[in-house]
């Protein structure tokens, strides 16, 4: 175990990373683990009074030197240029429903550059038995990711999905690419004002009771995203705040309203508010 509270150990680790950058042209690093739990059980460190979370902070500080980074565990690093993903998710519908509230919580804590783990679930054993893969879950997971700040595949979709479902995932990746400039602009803005990129409904409408909504979110200022999170569902209710909303399918909804919308497997419902903020 590396004691990063020791400046010599920190410098050694940094040197190892720098070597990979200089010798092999590595662009950046995915810093996995680093959890405080690894520094419990009476471990004695260089900085004698370090609490376990402090070691997580030292680990996170390593990434500040490398513009391309990703973390799962951080401590007191809000507002800094670190990409922060959610903890590993299992491939089940219960964990799928945790992605939106988890992303919102991270943003409100000051971690704007967030990633909802990996599409379909990030546990390393998730895709060892291909016969048990819930293809619908992978597709709906890709749809949740598509309009988040980051989108990350683990298993190759074409390896585990039917051609039709693989095509849906491809379209979601292309949708993410389509919104790339907008998401990047939001990231730049967040670096200046600290606002989350993924916002809860109550951010803009704080007195409407929207704080209980956990299955839809606002990207930026005016894009309402409402993915399907229920197995076998081909429609869902969407809560629209006041204003005129234009859907991905060209439909128009005038809010405030709650509307049941069609959401076949290939559709990620999203709606743009027609008033600029």
Predicted regions mapped to residue ranges:
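Carbohydrate-binding surfaces of carbohydrate-active enzymes
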Residues: 61-62, 144-277
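Aromatic- and carboxylate-enriched substrate-binding clefts and catalytic-loop regions
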Residues: 1-169, 204-205, 220
């Amino acid at each position: 175990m590396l004691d990063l509270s020791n400046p010599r150990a920190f410098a050694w680790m940094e040197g190892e990373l720098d070597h990979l950058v200089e010798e092999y042209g590595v662009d950046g690093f995915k810093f996995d683990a680093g959890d405080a739990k690894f520094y419990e059980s009476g471990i004695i460190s260089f900085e004698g009074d370090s609490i376990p979370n402090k070691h997580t902070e030292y680990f996170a500080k390593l990434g500040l030197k490398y513009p391309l980074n990703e973390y799962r565990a951080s401590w007191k690093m809000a507002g800094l240029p670190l990409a922060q993903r959610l903890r590993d998710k299992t491939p089940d519908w219960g964990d799928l429903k945790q992605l939106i509230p988890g992303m919102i919580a991270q943003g409100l804590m000051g971690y704007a550059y967030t990633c909802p783990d990996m599409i379909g679930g990030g546990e390393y054993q998730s895709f060892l038995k291909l016969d048990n893969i819930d293809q619908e879950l992978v597709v709906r997971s890709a749809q949740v990711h598509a309009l988040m700040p980051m989108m990350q595949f683990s298993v190759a979709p074409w390896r585990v999905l039917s051609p039709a479902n693989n095509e849906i995932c491809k379209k979601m990746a292309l949708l993410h690419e389509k919104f790339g400039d907008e998401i990047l602009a939001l990231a730049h803005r967040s670096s200046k004002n600290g606002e989350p990129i993924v916002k809860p409904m109550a951010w803009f409408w704080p007195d409407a009771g929207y704080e209980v909504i956990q299955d839809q979110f606002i990207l930026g200022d005016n894009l309402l995203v409402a993915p399907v999170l229920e197995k076998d569902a081909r429609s869902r209710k969407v809560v629209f705040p006041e204003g005129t909303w234009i859907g991905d399918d060209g439909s128009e909804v005038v809010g405030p309203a709650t509307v049941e919308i069609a959401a076949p497997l290939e559709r990620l419902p999203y709606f743009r508010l027609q008033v600029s903020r």
